[in-house]
Amino acid sequence: MKFIDEARIEAIAGNGGNGSASFRREKFVPFGGPDGGDGGRGGSVFAVADRNINTLIDFRYAKKHVARNGENGRGSDCYGAAGEDITLRMPVGTLITDMDTGEVIADLTEHGQRVCLAEGGMGGWGNLHFKSSTNRAPRQQVDGKPGERRMLKLELKVLADVGLLGMPNAGKSTFISHISNARPKVADYPFTTLHPNLGVVRVDHEQSFVVADIPGLIEGAAEGAGLGHQFLRHLQRTGLLLHIVDLAPFDEAVDPVAEARAIVNELKKYDETLYEKPRWLVLNKLDMVPEDERAAKVKDFLKRYKWKGPVFQISALTGEGCRELIYAIKDHLQAIKAEEAAALAEPDIRLDDRLHNVDQDQREA
């Protein structure tokens, strides 16, 4: 199935039905009084997150989604039927934005999360509501309210714990296929990966994490060059970035240090927040470097690159060093979760002070 991570749709809710202006008509009851029912509520348009969907392709072609109008009220105090709601199933990770106002309507981050995109109009009142002691035969009624109409932008940002960065042919796809159940296309030419791939890494029977592989970046990606800039948004939800560098490029004229710097520069241009995320350096293709030259090659790279963060040396093809990297990632993600849990459990001192002041005021009163 083709991967589509952006779409624009129009959500049109149903109008409310009109209220009825009618009067009770029965034998031997010449002045039966008003009995007009209310109009039905217009149908609403909802979105629900579904983990079984991984693309927005359905919304690339079906752009208009219209809910039914509510039925008009009738005599004998009959209310109009409500319009049927419609529900749009979207991938988990979809960000929904109102194109006219720029308002973020919803961020669907959990399976089953449901949100209203366009609310149906309220049904109008029938003349039964206007009966009073001075107006025994009201002829006024209220028309239904129009439903909401919105132009929406849908952006899919995949939910992953770890994101892979690197130049084309750095070995990202080989790496994710080695450590996870993902099976991306692997070939010896640039831009083999054309869309994001997700892989679940099983550390043991109880622990796992998700890795996202995006198309390789090239210099100028933030301005639109290559493919990667289209998919950098998929790394915004990750907790850790792995910068994979080809330590032994096929073309000897290519400098791995210059390529690594180019990737970091593109990241900074695209999004400062993404640039500030925790980032580890992963030197790949050790199998292409003779064992007696590895230490010197790595030392020279780190000296020229001036990198002081975590460094891992691997061969995605043979699996050398991959297991150690997996366990380090697991420990890092566990530490992040522990910090988040501690932050949630920490009491709000400001709230305690307010409660103390309220209690003291009550005692003095």
Curated annotation (Swiss-Prot):
Protein name as it appears in the record: GTPase Obg
GO biological process: ribosome biogenesis
The protein's Enzyme Commission number: 3.6.5.-
Location(s), subcellular: Cytoplasm
Domain Obg, chain residue ranges per copy: 1-159
GO molecular function, one term: magnesium ion binding
NCBIfam families cross-referenced by the UniProt entry: Obg_CgtA, PRK12296.1, PRK12297.1, PRK12299.1, small_GTP
Organism field: Cupriavidus taiwanensis (strain DSM 17343 / BCRC 17206 / CCUG 44338 / CIP 107171 / LMG 19424 / R1) (Ralstonia taiwanensis (strain LMG 19424))
Lineage: Bacteria, Pseudomonadati, Pseudomonadota, Betaproteobacteria, Burkholderiales
Keyword GTP-binding: yes
Keyword Ribonucleoprotein: no
Pfam families linked to this entry: GTP1_OBG, MMR_HSR1
GO cellular component, one term: cytoplasm
HAMAP family for the chain: GTPase_Obg
Domain OBG-type G: 160-334
PROSITE patterns reported in the protein's UniProt record: G_OBG, GTP1_OBG, OBG
Record CDD domains: Obg (cd01898)
Cofactor(s) needed: Mg(2+)
Ligand binding (GTP): 166-173, 191-195, 213-216, 284-287, 315-317
Homology family: Belongs to the TRAFAC class OBG-HflX-like GTPase superfamily. OBG GTPase family.
Domain of life per record: Bacteria
Quaternary state and interactors: Monomer.
Entry binding sites for Mg(2+): 173, 193
